[in-house]
Amino acid sequence: MRRKAASKRLTLTDQRFNDEIIYRLINAVMIDGKKSVATKVVYDAMDIVGEKSEESALDVFHKAMTNISPVVEVRGKRVGGATYQIPMEVRAERRVALALRWLKKYSESRSGKSMATRLAAEILDASNSQGSAVKKREEVHKMAEANKAFSHFRF
C-alpha cells in the first residue's frame, strides 16, 4: 500500500530580488555547497542582464524562463515488448526545474570568461527566443509532435 504523498516544501526567496526562481537558480548553479559563490555568480549575471537590456533584469529573466520552459515532453512506456515515446504535458514544477537545468547546462557549455557572463548571455538569448536552451525546448516539442500518434497510450 502506498504511503501518503510527501508535501511540497516551502521554497525560499533570494535576498535581492525576493524571487523563488532566482533562489532555485542560485541552488542550481551552486557547486560543492558554495552558496556564496553561486549567489555572486547569479547576481553578477543579473547585473550584466540589467545593463545590456532596457527592461529590468528580473523581467528579462522571467521572459527567458517562459521561453525555455517546455509545455510537452515524451516519456517512454512499454506496451507489448515495444517502448513507445508518449507525449505528456509537463507539470508546472517540472517545467521550472527543466528550464533551470537547461539554462545552467547550456551556460556552462558556452565560451566566455566567467560563469556570470556566460549565464547572462544565455538569459539574454533565451529572452529573445534564441540560444541553446530555447533550441533544446524546441527539440523536445518536436519529439512530442512527431510521436503524437501514441498520445492515446496514457499513463
UniProtKB/Swiss-Prot annotation:
It comes from Chloroherpeton thalassium (strain ATCC 35110 / GB-78). Keywords: Ribonucleoprotein, Ribosomal protein, RNA-binding, rRNA-binding, tRNA-binding. Part of the 30S ribosomal subunit. Contacts proteins S9 and S11. Belongs to the universal ribosomal protein uS7 family. HAMAP family: Ribosomal_uS7_B (MF_00480_B). This is Small ribosomal subunit protein uS7. GO terms for biological process: translation. SUPFAM superfamilies: Ribosomal protein S7 (SSF47973). Pfam families: Ribosomal_S7. GO terms for cellular component: small ribosomal subunit. One of the primary rRNA binding proteins, it binds directly to 16S rRNA where it nucleates assembly of the head domain of the 30S subunit. Is located at the subunit interface close to the decoding center, probably blocks exit of the E-site tRNA. Signal peptide: none annotated. NCBIfam families: rpsG_bact. One of its GO terms (molecular function) is tRNA binding.
